[in-house]
Amino acid sequence: MGIDVQKTNDTLIEFWNSSIALSKEDMDEERKNEVRDYRDLAPSEKLFHAVEELGSCKKVLDYGCGSGWASIVAAKSGCSDVTAVDMGQNIIDALDFYADLYEVKSCIKSLKISSDWLSTVKSDSFDGFVCSNVLDVVPVEVSKEILKETARIVTKDAKIVIGLNFYMSKEAAESRGMSLVDGKYLFVNDVLRLVSMSDEEWVELFKPYFKVEKLDHFAWPGEQKETRRLFILKRT
């Protein structure tokens, strides 16, 4: 059957740009919070500690940064040169707001990018890389291109952190009244929300460019089982 990659990407950018947008009221409410700890930004303790290790890197890239939790954690943990990129202006505005709120704006360079931005980056530019909940919410063709370019722009000894959602089987999807297009793509209201691939399938996708140093599983707050994936990679 196949999917329309360009249409899927355009819809994703529009969806996330709208979802992560902060209103003036949102910002005012955030500023009222007198107790603020950057360690609470990460969706799991395991993910926090993985990104915390990027603090020792000289230059970190947060690809698909969202509201910037990983960029802030890396900066707070010691990295003074973090580049945070995403494809929606509302997303970048949210990142800038939180970077200022957590007093690390001077350490984070934010960029609204296009889909071909990685190809413009010089080789061996970053010794730290984080990509959380991006590779498994875009078409596989896009993930492959991201991985290919990432392998080129990171250094040989770079620390690479990849966060992924859970695997959902065809049967599990059907039990929820949903179906997987091409056996792996889960759409909700015409928006791609999950590329459901097993741990082994992801390892195969990484294999041309990276070796897996560690695979762990974690849960988001409120989840009973640790089914989300945390990969630590090294360039081959």
Give the location of each predicted region.
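Class I (Rossmann-like) S-adenosyl-L-methionine-dependent methyltransferase catalytic domain
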Residues: 1-55, 66-118, 138, 142, ...
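A short acidic, Gly/Pro-enriched loop at the edge of an enzyme's catalytic core
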Residues: 119-129
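Conserved beta-strand/loop positions that form the S-adenosyl-L-methionine
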Residues: 63
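A short glycine-rich, Lys/Arg-flanked "PGG" loop and its adjoining helix->strand segment in the class I
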Residues: 144-156
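A short beta-strand submotif of the Rossmann-like class I SAM-dependent methyltransferase core
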Residues: 131-134
